[in-house]
Amino acid sequence: MYLWFFFVTIKKRFAGGFLMKSKKNIILIGMPGAGKSTIGVLLAKSLLMDFADTDLLIQRKHSAALCEIIAAKGIDEFLQIENDVICASEFYNCVVATGGSAVYGEEAMAKLGSEGTVVYLKVGPDELEKRINNIHTRGIAMKEGTSIAQLYEERAPLYEKYADITVDCAALTPEECVDAISDMIK
């Protein structure tokens, strides 16, 4: 656990120990490109939990890629769809990778926060620029002309608001992130 000390911040501690003891799920939030889906799959395997990706749930429900949904319905309607899909979903003993824009949905985040430990996978805008090479086809809910740095500045306070644990993933491999999260929730 001490190895991850400089990369992990715990915002809240529950009586009787770390966060996972009283909650059933692990909820991953963060910017597109932070590694939520990759780390989520690895974390679920290591903890013998199920895995869900809310972006995939949205795509399955609407039979379209995220970028197609955003193009057809607009950002505001997409955000409502995302909020509604999360609120209607049932997760138990599950690692949940959310879309980067899930933090705009107050109802969704209240539900997720009440049902799981929320982990913010923090990666700064410079590293995100390196990781995201398909910004227009990826299905990122952002206004035309907005840069990744601007989107980060807009969303970072929301990620911090909802996070129980923050893991700075910029300098860590996915496996190291999994180890850091696992150590903190035990």
Model-derived regions: residue spans:
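NTP-dependent small-molecule kinase module
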Residues: 20-22, 42, 46, 117, ...
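Hydrophobic anchor at the beta1->P-loop junction of P-loop NTPases
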Residues: 28
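P-loop (Walker A) phosphate-binding loop of NTP-binding proteins
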Residues: 31
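A glycine- and Lys/Arg-enriched "phosphate-lid" helix/loop adjacent to the NTP-binding pocket
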Residues: 114-157
